[in-house]
Amino acid sequence: MVDVGKWPIFTLLSPQEAGSIRKACVFGTSANEAIYVTDNDEVFVFGLNYSNCLGTGDNQSTLVPKKLEALCGKKIKSLSYGSGPHVLLTTEDGVVYAWGHNGYSQLGNGTTNQGIAPVQVCTNLLIKQVIEVACGSHHSMALAADGELFAWGYNNCGQVGSGSTANQPTPRKVTNCLHTKRVVNIACGQTSSMAVLDSGEVYGWGYNGNGQLGLGNNGNQLTPVRVAALHGMCVNQIVCGYAHTLALTDEGLLYAWGANTYGQLGTGSKNNLLSPTQIMVEKERVIEIAACHSTHTSAAKTQGGHVYMWGQCRGQSVILPHLTHFCCTDDVFACFGTPAVSWRLLSVEHEDFLTVAESLKKEFDSPEIADLKFRIDGKYIHVHKAVLKIRCEHFRSMFQSYWNEDMKEVIEIDQFSYPVYRAFLQYLYTDTVDLPPEDAIGLLDLATSYCENRLKRLCQHIIKRGITVENAFSLFSAAVRYDAEDLEEFCFKFCINHLTEVTQTAAFWQMDGPLLKEFIAKASKCGAFKN
């Protein structure tokens, strides 16, 4: 859970103001500016207001939050900022707004005039639904839902990807080798740009003096170039620090390259790397990585919930990933980043909203006031009929007077294992699932049987994070069997991306005939067997 109170600037707010925050971002050269969205979708800013970056219509700093009427009710989805700073955001409707520093046309309005208030970025984006934005020091990028990528602003090193070093005053589609490809994730270093395709391929362009493009050399690139060293890897997240890059594959493997003056690559040395190198090899599967173009800090979160940090951490150079006591990567930047900015738009939850939920959680499997027990594999789980009836339609029907179970104090369960059924009952009390991917398959079966659609989605999420070459076909089979279309497509893509390896596994040869034929036919349609 993100706690905005860990950022010093938010201590200026009253408890009531801080308690209303649902989204937030801290930015600026010294982390002296902040923007936040309240639970009723009002947008406020406060801080130094350097280069009009607060968007209040004037250049006055303020310790008291000011409302940005132009953005209230817009439902901000993605937000990024530059070094000027300038601010760029997109709404849930895909509309892009920008304001602040504009000395290099990074606001995309065709001028170099400061943007004193939020203004919609229209050129080439008016008919696009933008789903993600990213900012470098003085350039900007916007990713559309159809996979098209647009860039503009400062272009001294080719970071806009236009093929020249002339500044780009308005959004321009990044073409060349990306022309017919679909981009799904973007990131900016200070003067470099990175993109991930739906195929898992990675492309980079712009400044490369520290090897941050991962091309094996340090020559700048004026147009996108594929990171060939990641061939065979399917990357699903990429982030950039000031002059280094981190990439996370669909197998939970972490790669780093670029500048390493502060140990931000986590290799155990301070030598720059011109090509991607795997780090955290001995650690458990990584599920999230974090970096920010304003800092030389890196962070990662593993499947077990452990958060690591390395690089420049409060003046120290941490050259290997260091295990922290934080629960999220955002806390690393709040407490150890220099400056203490946000690496992404924060999503905030508050414990005071969980009073009832926490009470229910405490009573799960507590025999004191329970009125029902489930017996699975010789073990008991204590529950409350009222809670089960409220939370699950299956139990609501079961505990009607005409069901035998309504009169029982102990119900025997033999079609599901103890860990699976316990996780299900615990979910009814906590709305969360805590299971390894292997057991999540059984829980997916239960969720399908009990028509618990949200539980199915949670199981699919766990399974996706635990997919490997060895279990990919087993998970694909389970997804088909339990009619989990999203999971089926995810597993299918994973199998295609690692086709040679997964076809050598036992799970592949254990697939039943009809399903195997269906897989081969589908793989053939997407060109998996072309020479």
From Swiss-Prot:
It is found in: Nucleus. Residues 370-437, 470-499 form the BTB domain. In the retina, mainly expressed in the inner retina with strong signals reaching up to the outer plexiform layer (at protein level). RCC1 repeats lie at residues 40-91, 93-145, 147-198, 199-250, 252-302, 304-356. PROSITE patterns: BTB (PS50097), RCC1_2 (PS00626), RCC1_3 (PS50012). Its main location: nucleus. The keyword Nucleus applies. GO terms for biological process: chromatin organization. Keywords: Cell cycle, Chromatin regulator, Nucleus, Repeat, Transcription, Transcription regulation. CDD domains: BACK_RCBTB1, BTB_POZ_RCBTB1_CLLD7. SMART domains: BTB. One of its GO terms (cellular component) is nucleus. The keyword Glycoprotein does not apply. May be involved in cell cycle regulation by chromatin remodeling. PANTHER family: BTK-BINDING PROTEIN-RELATED, RCC1 AND BTB DOMAIN-CONTAINING PROTEIN 1 ISOFORM X1. This is RCC1 and BTB domain-containing protein 1. It comes from Mus musculus (Mouse). The gene is Rcbtb1.
